[in-house]
Amino acid sequence: MDLSKLQNGSDVRGVALAGVENEPVTLDDAAVRAIAGGFARFLRARLGKESCRVSVGRDSRLSGGAIAETLCETLAACGAEVTDLGLCTTPAMFMTTVTGERPFDAAVMITASHLPWNRNGLKFFTAAGGAESADVREILRLAAEETPFAPGGSVARGEFMETYAAILREKIIAAANGNEKPLAGKHIVVDAGNGAGGFFAERVLAPLGADTAGSRYLDPDGRFPNHVPNPELPEAMDSIREAVLESHADFGVIFDTDVDRAGAVLSNGEELNRNRLIALISAILLREHPGTAIVTDSITSTGLAEFIAAHGGVHRRFRRGYRNVINEALRLNAAGQDCQLAIETSGHAALKENYFLDDGAYLVTRFLMEIAAGRSLESLLEGLYEPVESREFRLKILAEDFRAAGTAVLDSLAEYAKEQPGWSIAPDNCEGVRVNLDKAHGDGWFLLRLSLHDPILPLNIESDREHGARTIARELAPFLAQQTEIDASSALEFTL
């Protein structure tokens, strides 16, 4: 098998279990062994050490245990000192490389985030951070070569989630001036979606005095029987919103499968995801770091940009992909512009104070620090103007070479936009084609971009008036109807 096909940006992803029609297993035992060998060789070259200490963790996926066993055995056979940490979160696995008197040299997290039950994957970490796409390419290249077995390896069992939870608890206690029960009297519910996030209710909130009654789906179950653990999905946010309102909670928290993303709900049922989530953490950080830059992905609203500017911040809209926004934040800091936050509307949030690690639990902890200090989260959102309407369409690219075809469509759109009355191409856009439309032509904007990994052109539309999204779609319809390499039917049907 060509292992390079398992690369998905800075991760490895594949089908790990049979059972879905037309989805043959690609991340099988042989592939895991080869990749483990490639990672061992990669570490030897990168760290300059013959023997490394490596931690291995997994989320609740059904295939996780078997993959972990194979991974640990192979790494040990390559001379590594391996500790299997069992059920963990992705952020916690990175923290094993920077925590304690003897941090691990590297970590591997077994997860496929929010993908279906039959999928799984691998994320790689050292103390320098998560692997880049180029690192994963090199690991898979080395994996295709013969595994370099070496003596001296071992496999042990361990536990880290209590250590990680203690770090989060201490942050909240410090924000409350040392009060050991800073959340006493607060009712906070968690929806873990049967992923790895149940620990947050049991090991963070409850020990700090919070009432967590009404929390949902805390038990790990890799079948994900209740809803997909993905804060971007309406059904997931509906679940935590329902939990908050039914239990009359003060606050609600929802995580994705491996807890590198989060969303939240206020006591009145108002959802904190996408633009609201970014606005809330931006307001907190701009109070603490006036003038700092906030890097976001490309589909944030005009109202969010105005909110960040009104709070004295510098908004840098960048390309989708959590590694992209993190790397842009690192670049800004290196260039002399303080940047405290890299965040996506998907719920990935990486703070400078936390190793620029995208960590959903840490993001929520920052909100709980405000609550513990007696501050109102609702007041922090005052002044955020939100669009009246927003829509997203996913236009399938029909051509085999989808990148070339998608790029050609975007190039054509950029030229087309220049000739349209009431249209203006956004000057601060770094991905796809973003066009602002005046009041007579829809009073909003649209963004057409190429998906990071899939043969899709996502189309986002926002308008500041009722029926404005349909007006904008109608403005764009003549162009879309001419594009033979894409299926634009969903957007075109919306115009009817």
Task: List the predicted regions and their residue ranges.
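Gly/Ser/Thr-enriched, mixed-charge loops and adjacent short helices
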Residues: 101, 118-244
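Phosphate-binding and adjacent anionic-ligand microenvironments
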Residues: 289-496
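N-terminal small/polar loop signature for handling phosphorylated ligands or for N-terminal nucleophile
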Residues: 41, 53-119, 203-265
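Proline/glycine-rich low-complexity loops and linkers
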Residues: 76, 85-86, 90, 141-170, ...
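Short glycine-rich phosphate-binding loop at a beta-alpha junction
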Residues: 49-59, 83, 187-189, 292-298, ...
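An N-terminal, well-structured beta->alpha segment
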Residues: 1-71, 77, 154-185
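Gly/Ser/Thr-rich loops at beta-strand to alpha-helix junctions
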Residues: 59-65, 115-116, 193-198, 259-260, ...
